[in-house]
Amino acid sequence: MKSLTSFVINEASSEIIDKMKNALKEELNAWYGYIIVKEWLEGTDRKDIEKFYEDTAKDELEDHGYWLMKRINQLGGTIEDITISPNSWKDANHKYISPTWKNGNIDIKKSIEDNIINEEGAIETYRELVKLTDGVDPASNSKLKKILADEEEHLQELKDFLEDIK
């Protein structure tokens, strides 16, 4: 017979894994969006925004996404459905917003506005995960707080860029 403690932990682990899988989809969507805009900004006079998009794409994939993949596996989840088929990314709670084009070029103002929406969604997701892992999974909770801080920093930088180009 299972103890109540192990049942609660298992239930919490299942919910944590599901939320982490959603966060992974959001991170992959974010990486894709940032890298596309970065490539289209290459050669423009906004090297600062191009550098932000390049660095943020790396954060989303190499730090956040990779950690989520490892942690989901460590907790007993699987990621094959997410990593093998980018079509599964569209099931994320916060959807990818594709870059907006204007006269054959990226509309940088609109792209920044869209990325602000994406970062706000990521912040919401990570706040939920931080709350969910608090007192249940200290290792995940610590890293999730760091990722949340990164997402809040990304949001502020995007808002600063938006203010600068208005």
What are these regions (language model features)?
Residues 150, 164-166:
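Structured surface interface patches that mediate subunit assembly and partner/cofactor docking
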Residues 2-11:
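Proteolytic processing junctions in secreted/extracellular precursors
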Residues 19-26, 30-33, 37, 66-71, ...:
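Acidic/histidine-rich alpha-helical segments that form the ligand environment
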Residues 153-157:
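Vicinal oxygen chelate
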Residues 37-89, 158-162:
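Conserved alpha-helical segments that form or flank metal/cofactor-binding pockets of metalloenzymes
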Residues 15, 44-55, 107, 139-146:
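A structural signal for alpha-helical segments
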